[in-house]
A protein has these predicted regions:
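Active-site-adjacent pocket-lining segments in enzyme domains
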Residues: 1-121
Length: 121
């Protein structure tokens, strides 16, 4: 996982317009590196075209934004489609983190961490 962040408005608006970040995201996406965003941040991915034709999710008030940009929206807590992981918000943050850990370190490591924080799915 190369980039992972969570911002809400107006932060995502500023991030979407910050050229060094969008260039880096595009480089990572084009190289097939794993990228992840939660809450409103998936709208930055969709604005860059990363979610077009992909399953994705976001904070409820941003679902229309990512759908308008071509995402196939889902209300799942976490959606992994290829190298892109998206999640809905604070209430799904543990699921999001465990998904990323699973992708990077495997299911056993994610289970170990879930147990260490007394997480119950």
């Amino acid at each position: 996982m190369q980039i992972c962040w969570c911002f809400r408005e107006p932060g995502t608006k500023y991030l979407a317009g910050y050229k060094p970040l969008t260039e880096l995201l595009t480089e990572f996406y084009d190289d097939g590196r794993k990228i992840a965003a939660i809450c409103a941040a998936p709208s930055v991915f969709s604005g860059l075209g990363f979610l077009k034709g992909r399953r994705a999710t976001a904070y409820p008030s941003f679902m229309d934004v990512i759908e308008r940009d071509g995402a196939m929206t889902s209300t799942d807590s976490v959606v992994v489609d290829g190298n892109v992981t998206t999640s809905r918000g604070l209430g799904t943050a543990v699921d999001f983190a465990l998904s990323i850990i699973t992708q990077l370190e495997g299911k056993e490591k994610a289970q170990e961490i879930a147990e260490s924080v007394v997480y119950r799915a």
